[in-house]
Amino acid sequence: MMAAMATARVRMGPRCAQALWRMPWLPVFLSLAAAAAAAAAEQQVPLVLWSSDRDLWAPAADTHEGHITSDLQLSTYLDPALELGPRNVLLFLQDKLSIEDFTAYGGVFGNKQDSAFSNLENALDLAPSSLVLPAVDWYAVSTLTTYLQEKLGASPLHVDLATLRELKLNASLPALLLIRLPYTASSGLMAPREVLTGNDEVIGQVLSTLKSEDVPYTAALTAVRPSRVARDVAVVAGGLGRQLLQKQPVSPVIHPPVSYNDTAPRILFWAQNFSVAYKDQWEDLTPLTFGVQELNLTGSFWNDSFARLSLTYERLFGTTVTFKFILANRLYPVSARHWFTMERLEVHSNGSVAYFNASQVTGPSIYSFHCEYVSSLSKKGSLLVARTQPSPWQMMLQDFQIQAFNVMGEQFSYASDCASFFSPGIWMGLLTSLFMLFIFTYGLHMILSLKTMDRFDDHKGPTISLTQIV
């Protein structure tokens, strides 16, 4: 089944290949093509659907090689299964997955015993109806849970294997079960094959439980974001291959974001640098905040319309200081979408509270918010405005990112950036384009103004003599 997803290779003769590589523009063209292909691959994830009912999808509906399925097209595939199929829907949500994972680790070329997707392949073979979409737009997947909730009229229930065995599912009542696969492809302690095999075992155990209870169902497997099977290689215009004995660059250590959890991850917060000043005395809170297991999140709170992330630090400036990020989620009728806003940032210390307005930290609730600088300093944009001036407190967050609504796992959704449209780089590009357009127009005008001479003197011919008439 997965072998059909592998692409065929085209072989070139040695003479043709040597002739092509003599062309100076070919490496540059291949570099740009590879970069464009890599950028496009990061925007899509696969989606696998199967059901215990028959005739939910047409036999040729899954022939989508090279096509990216949009959210509208995905709804046309899901509507028949949700309206005519079973009312019990399972959504297996993995951290990272790409179509290349099936090619690299699936049971292709008859090697079924080496497949990391044995339970998934068996489920697809035995399912009366199945559908495989190799490339689905990330936006469609990010809104899949909300779409299923609206179509079924049931809230998503986060379950694990133990909880599923205790549930009593009814074929007539709708149920949306969200199963987060416990292994993530970002784990450095496990190989990708072991990660995918562990996820496949969870899928097999869940399906066995439903089969033993004789419960009809429709299942879907997808991921939050794509993964990369091959190791990233820097593509430059000068050449595509690695240099011999090249030393691999050491990647910087990136700490995981701060995550507030109740029954699931609710609020995510990250910054490359988190610094605070009190009476012009600066303290770097980055090593005390990110990657710290004992971070005090007492006072944090979350629901669908309001979120509060509370960070408490002891012995900061000689006392206990608490920073509270207050966010609200509202539905705006004009856009018919939910937007979140960080209403304020509170600093609690010694019984006093300092307030910073942060109304410019806003975006659609399905996205996270990212900004290069969120600071109270004027030279850094002043997105944080103190209510009382002058304030003894100063804040500076570099490469700031936060998400408090529609969080799925320990990873941020795609970010809504604070960068304005008319940035200095865009102004430079516009002015340069206008200047080049002026030069082109002037040159075209000069070319069109050229005139040919219909008469001229022939210096090699006889001279013209004029007789003087008296």
Swiss-Prot record:
GO terms for cellular component: clathrin-coated vesicle membrane; endoplasmic reticulum membrane; endoplasmic reticulum-Golgi intermediate compartment membrane; endosome membrane; extracellular exosome; Golgi membrane; lysosomal membrane; membrane. GO terms for biological process: cellular response to increased oxygen levels; endosomal lumen acidification; endosome to plasma membrane protein transport; Golgi lumen acidification; intracellular iron ion homeostasis; intracellular pH reduction; lysosomal lumen acidification; osteoclast development. It holds the Pfam family VAS1_LD. The keyword Cytoplasm does not apply. The keyword Transmembrane helix applies. The chain crosses the membrane at residues 420-440. Glycans are attached at residues 170, 261, 273, 296, 303, 350, 357. Residues 1-41 form the signal peptide. Disulfide bonds join 371-418. GO terms for molecular function: ATPase activator activity; small GTPase binding; transporter activator activity. It is found in: Endoplasmic reticulum membrane; Endoplasmic reticulum-Golgi intermediate compartment membrane; Cytoplasmic vesicle, Secretory vesicle, Synaptic vesicle membrane; Cytoplasmic vesicle, Clathrin-coated vesicle membrane. Coiled coil: none annotated. It is a single-pass type I membrane protein. The modification Phosphoserine is found at residue 465. The record marks 231-232 as: Cleavage. Belongs to the vacuolar ATPase subunit S1 family. It is linked to Immunodeficiency 47: A complex immunodeficiency syndrome characterized by hypogammaglobulinemia, recurrent bacterial infections, defective glycosylation of serum proteins, and liver disease with neonatal jaundice and hepatosplenomegaly. Some patients may also have neurologic features, including seizures, mild intellectual disability, and behavioral abnormalities. Inheritance is X-linked recessive. This is V-type proton ATPase subunit S1. It comes from Homo sapiens (Human).
